[in-house]
Amino acid sequence: MAKKIDNKALSCSFCCKNQNEVKKLIAGFSGFICDECIELCIHLIEEERKSNLAISNYSKLPPKKIYEAINAHVVGQQQAAKILAVAVYIQCIRFEHRELADLVAKSNVLLIGPTGCGKTLIAQTLAKIINVPFAMADATSLTEAGYVGEDVENIILRLLQAADFNVERAQKGIIYIDEIDKIARKSENPSITRDVSGEGVQQALLKIMEGTIALVPPQGGRKHPQQEFIQIDTTNMLFICGGAFTGIEKIIEARTSQSTIGFEATVKSKHDQDYNQILNNLEADDLTKFGLIPEFLGRLPVIATLSDLNQQSLVDILTKPKNALVKQYQKLFELDGAELIFEEEALVAIAQKALAKKTGARGLRAILECVLLDTMFELSNLKNMQVIITADIVKNNLKPIIKPKLQKKSAKKKVTA
């Protein structure tokens, strides 16, 4: 510990606190450091070590492990999970072997599927699996620079914020752009008028998706024009774009039906092929006709189509994932000493309601909230009680059955979640 020199109180060379304000002051050859600054340095070094460890560890995950981890959270999208697992593995190889970065191009992904099928969840799950920063943006809010709306650089700012402004970590993050189909140009032919929220946004996204040194305003670009910009290399960022692309099945059907014209052509009813079968025939030209410019599609080499969820898939989503909705509510009831039981028929009824509303998996929570709202309001008074949800309760908006907990022998069958 440092001592007073010439009866003058010594101070830390870093925080300038004198020795009376700190517990210990350590002397060096030409200065002093206090115990608080030492603790701060240790914390910063540990955080940096964890960050570097996380970045290096994820590269060792093989595609099969990534695939299994996705399927633990996302139900009914095995093919899309396999495609994404390979794409992320290629990205990991590029991180581990930087000399291959110029030789092996990154695999930006385009996810196509109806609302509520799990596009956003897959992207979020991927970021958690490989432990990298994740940011999400809505394409409908983006405009070209200089117009009212959000600049594309703000997407990178969100990723930087998710990485706690650690530029090195942010440069290896994942950006998910939702509703990408909403920035399709209005017609297949180039327009002579300015399309600042459609084709203009696609043009603005080209550079950052391909890889460039982006100048990111840390406080947002338009309200603080005098601020200093942060330089971020987007070369190693993985971009995942998702959209429902409503109506693209008609474009695919029109193309495929033209190739089977003639006396020997098989006449098919519109009901012969479902949505999932039609999407399996998707080609890049179909997306161009929908309104995505060829240059933009060129930055999205990997295209994965997600299946429309059927009744059984929705029932599985309710019970099978690690964070399944039924498990979440059962845990909440358990914390208050109550037991929540869903009969099998009740789960089917919930899935049928979601299908009728065409909200996919996204609508399941809203239905459960509606069924359990009054019961949750009185949950603190339901200790040692059993709450049973039947199909009739779900279909007719009735109150759940509440009764004292029964012995295992006489208890109704509980859904294994």
Curated annotation (Swiss-Prot):
Q: SMART domains attached here?
A: AAA (SM00382), ClpB_D2-small (SM01086), zf-C4_ClpX (SM00994)
CDD domains documented for this protein = RecA-like_ClpX
Q: Which PROSITE patterns does the entry link to?
A: CLPX_ZB
SUPFAM superfamilies membership: Glucocorticoid receptor-like (DNA-binding domain) (SSF57716), P-loop containing nucleoside triphosphate hydrolases (SSF52540)
The yes or no answer to whether the keyword Ion transport is present is no
User: Which residues are listed for Zn(2+) binding in this entry?
Assistant: 12, 15, 34, 37
Alphabetically, the GO molecular function entries are: ATP binding; ATP hydrolysis activity; ATP-dependent protein folding chaperone; protein dimerization activity; unfolded protein binding; zinc ion binding
Keyword RNA-binding assigned: no
Kindly list the positions annotated as binding ATP. 114-121
This protein's UniProt keywords: ATP-binding, Chaperone, Metal-binding, Nucleotide-binding, Zinc
Top-level taxon: Bacteria
The biological process GO terms on file are:
cell division; proteolysis involved in protein catabolic process
For the ClpX-type ZB domain, which residue ranges apply?
1-53
Q: Name one GO cellular component term.
A: HslUV protease complex
As for what it does, the entry says:
ATP-dependent specificity component of the Clp protease. It directs the protease to specific substrates. Can perform chaperone functions in the absence of ClpP.
Q: How does it assemble?
A: Component of the ClpX-ClpP complex. Forms a hexameric ring that, in the presence of ATP, binds to fourteen ClpP subunits assembled into a disk-like structure with a central cavity, resembling the structure of eukaryotic proteasomes.
Instruction: State the protein's name.
Output: ATP-dependent Clp protease ATP-binding subunit ClpX
Organism in which the protein naturally occurs: Orientia tsutsugamushi (strain Ikeda)
